[in-house]
């Protein structure tokens, strides 16, 4: 089993579905030009989510409508937070909703209660993880 260049997310999906932990990467001529492993995919995931920057991650369930993520982002910015990453998912949510995961930093922890209160008016809070303080809250 090999994967082509450029590597696509569907390639990672095939590797996962078949429980393959690594595979050669081949060019258009079929020549092996490298390898891809689960560790490589984990590194990409870590880079995309911004977890290396620590900070705070909040998960929401919000209406799937234009502007719903912007509303959350505006609230965070208004409280002095800066966003590292925003991820969304439609897995395990009712029709018309989506999950939104926002990782942020630069927020004064003393302002966190007011931020959570305002965010809760805009979307359903699912959980909060403060990686610096090693604290988790599930709602």
Please state what every model-predicted region is.
Residues 1-14, 25-27, 32-33, 52-53, ...:
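Bateman/CBS regulatory modules and CBS-like beta-alpha motifs in cytosolic regions of diverse proteins
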Residues 6-8, 37, 108:
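Helix N-cap and loop-to-helix transition residues
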Residues 16, 20, 26, 42:
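Conserved glycine-bearing catalytic or ligand-binding loops at nucleotide- and phosphate-handling centers
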Residues 21, 33-41:
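Short hydrophobic beta-strand motif reused across regulatory alpha/beta modules
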Residues 25, 37, 70:
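Short, flexible micro-motifs
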Residues 42-43, 84:
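Conserved mixed alpha/beta catalytic, RNA-binding, or beta-rich assembly cores of soluble enzyme
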Residues 48-139:
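A conserved regulatory-domain signal marking ACT and ACT-like small-molecule sensing domains
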């Amino acid at each position: 089993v090999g994967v082509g260049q450029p590597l696509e997310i569907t390639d990672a999906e095939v590797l996962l579905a078949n429980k393959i932990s690594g595979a050669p990467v081949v060019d258009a001529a079929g020549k092996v030009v490298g390898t891809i492993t689960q560790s490589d995919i984990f590194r990409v995931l870590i880079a995309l989510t911004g977890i290396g920057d620590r900070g705070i991650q909040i998960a929401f369930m919000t209406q799937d409508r234009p502007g719903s993520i912007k509303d959350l982002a505006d609230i965070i910015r208004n409280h002095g937070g800066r966003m590292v990453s925003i991820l969304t998912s439609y897995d395990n949510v009712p029709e018309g909703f989506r999950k939104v995961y926002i990782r942020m930093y630069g927020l004064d922890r003393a302002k966190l209660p007011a931020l959570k209160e305002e965010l809760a008016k805009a979307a359903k809070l699912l959980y909060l993880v403060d990686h610096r303080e090693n604290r988790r809250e599930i709602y």
